[in-house]
């Protein structure tokens, strides 16, 4: 991989001998790494809303679904339920089948 650094002087020599072909190949090769260096990185910053446990997923409409407990259980599967205090024991058995047991949220 140390050969790419001396590569820029070589296309100049290939230009005179090979014509525009050497220039096109060198231009395509040079643009690739430059674009890769300018790609933005993804930064995740903590929000100041509600503190969320590590790994807990929340749907954007969770606040609208807090009223009817049955629709919340059907719409928000296990990722948001285990984080609730007091309901972790009840939801442990219904994690995979929360839609099959609609009475589970009514217990707690």
UniProtKB/Swiss-Prot annotation:
Residues 63-85 have a biased composition (Low complexity). Residues 1-108 are annotated as: Disordered. Residues 1-11 have a biased composition (Pro residues). InterPro entries: LBH_dom (IPR038990), LBH_dom_prot (IPR042945). It comes from the Eukaryota. Pfam families: Lbh. Residues 37-62 form the LBH domain. This is LBH domain-containing protein 2.
């Amino acid at each position: 991989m140390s050969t790419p650094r001396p590569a820029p002087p070589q296309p100049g020599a290939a230009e005179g001998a090979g014509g525009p072909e050497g220039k096109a190949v060198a231009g395509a090769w040079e643009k690739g790494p430059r674009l890769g260096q300018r790609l933005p990185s993804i930064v995740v910053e903590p929000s100041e809303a509600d503190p969320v446990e590590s790994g807990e997923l929340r749907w954007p409409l969770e606040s609208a679904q807090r009223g009817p407990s049955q629709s919340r259980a059907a719409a928000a599967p296990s990722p948001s339920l285990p984080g609730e205090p007091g309901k972790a024991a009840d939801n442990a058995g219904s994690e995979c089948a929360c839609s099959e047991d609609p009475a589970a949220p009514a217990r707690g």
